[in-house]
A protein has these predicted regions:
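Interfacial helix-cap and linker-helix signal at transmembrane-aqueous boundaries
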Residues: 46-47, 78-79, 159-172, 176, ...
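Intracellular juxtamembrane helix-capping segments at the cytosolic ends
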Residues: 46, 124-138, 325-338
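Helix-loop-helix hairpin linking two adjacent transmembrane segments in secondary transporters
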Residues: 149-197
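C-terminal transmembrane helical hairpin of 12-TM major facilitator-type secondary transporters
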Residues: 237, 257, 263-275, 280-333
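C-terminal ends and interior cores of transmembrane alpha-helices
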Residues: 93-106, 295-307
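Extracytoplasmic gate region of multi-pass secondary transporters
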Residues: 39-44, 219-278
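A late C-terminal transmembrane helix in Major Facilitator Superfamily
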Residues: 157, 337-374
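Hydrophobic core of transmembrane alpha-helices in multi-pass small-molecule transporters
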Residues: 29-30, 98, 109-125, 231, ...
Length: 374
């Protein structure tokens, strides 16, 4: 009698709970990445009150990126070994506590420290480890499922900064952080208890030496190439994400108008991530990635030369679609090229270089402003 592969999925129908996981991780990543994107809205009020430079304040974004990158790799090892059952709960509590403490900050050391904690024990937990989890719930059109899940980050980076801008204008930056902390606790904590590990990854933990993989390159070679690609793509995308709102307000736009442009950029990114994942199902993850990466590179060049608000909205739509599609395609490339039991580590390692690129781009953008005054 032949022995069946323990990792084989015995039904062509994807588990219904996989779609519940898509919804859960969509919302958790929306909250996690939303606070990351909202730094651009808090940048000028904090710099004005504490007399910080743009470069110093922009390092708050770098603090999240750095801690998410470093701790994300560690959480990837934990996820591949023990699963992600409690990742959502821990992240919900830490994100809430960090935002609350940011409302009480009195120095730039506090600012960096609380955002570092937010990234290390909040954003890092609901990022790559949970994306790897969701990726293996699906056998039919995994790109679409991954794209919808990844769209949560773009949605959050659109709505959270916009709401933060309204709260800052109405009540001040301290109250805005406080309101965000309360909202995160109410929304994220119940969802955290719904996180479950995918059946494929559970089998991979039970049978680590018997995992199907067809991609010709070694997993280490795959990681080197993907990490290099992600480093440069994220360096490019982080500059408008962090500095678009200050750029527009410096040009005479109101804070609400500037944040609405960022919101349009991120909401178009929701569609970009979904269709980017679907495109990966149709033409393959790697060709889809190349197409989306080319798009973001072309569109980002036009932001400094565009002043008309309507034209800015149009540019935001195109850039948001392209840059967000990059993330879905990278996740699909990783899923295609590595084994299930290595997926969380692989996605976390590529994310490490992604966050490094985003942190570098955010700081360099602020530094160039300080050097040139625009």
């Amino acid at each position: 009698m032949s022995q069946s592969n323990p990792l084989e999925i015995r039904s062509d129908r994807d588990p219904l709970y996989g779609w519940i996981m898509v919804g859960v991780v969509f919302i958790l990543s929306a909250l996690a990445f939303g606070a990351l994107g909202s730094i651009s809205v808090f940048l000028k009020p904090l710099a004005t009150e504490f007399s910080w430079t743009r470069a110093e304040t922009s390092l708050g974004y770098t603090a999240i990126a750095l801690s998410s990158a470093l701790f994300g790799v560690a959480w990837g090892f934990v996820a591949d070994r023990f699963g992600t059952r409690w990742f959502g709960v821990i992240a919900a509590l830490v994100m809430t506590a960090s935002l609350y403490m940011l409302s009480k900050q009195t120095s730039i050391v506090h600012f960096y420290a609380f955002y570092f904690i937010y990234g290390a024990f909040g954003n890092a937990l609901v990022g790559s480890p949970l994306f790897a989890n969701v990726a293996y719930w699906f056998r039919q059109q995994p790109g679409l499922a991954i794209g919808i899940t990844a769209a949560g980050g773009a949605f959050g980076q659109g709505i959270v900064p916009y709401l933060a801008g309204i709260m800052i204008e109405g009540s001040g930056w301290r109250e805005a952080y406080m309101f965000m902390a309360c909202g995160y606790l109410i929304i994220a904590l119940p969802l955290g208890f719904l996180v479950r590990e995918s059946p494929v990854r559970l089998r991979a933990m039970q049978f680590p030496d018997d995992q199907p993989r067809t991609f010709p390159l070694k997993e280490t070679e795959v990681l080197i190439w993907l990490s290099a690609a992600v480093l440069f793509c994220c360096n490019c995308m982080s500059v408008p994400i962090v500095h678009l709102v200050p750029l527009l307000t410096d040009a005479g736009q109101s804070l609400s108008s500037a944040t609405s442009v960022l919101m349009v950029l991120m909401f178009s990114g929701v569609l970009g991530r979904i269709l980017g994942g679907k495109l990966g199902d149709v033409i393959g993850p790697l060709p889809a990635y190349l197409l989306m990466s080319l798009g973001q590179t072309v569109f980002v060049l036009w932001f400094p030369f565009t002043e008309n608000l309507v034209t800015l909205y149009v540019l935001a739509v195109f850039f948001g679609f392209a840059y967000s599609g990059v993330m879905s395609c990278i996740l699909m490339c990783t899923r295609m090229m590595v084994s299930p039991g290595f997926a969380a580590r692989a996605m976390s390692i590529t994310s490490f270089f992604g966050y490094g690129g985003m942190g570098m781009g955010a700081f360099v953008g602020g530094l160039l402003f300080d050097m040139n005054g625009n």
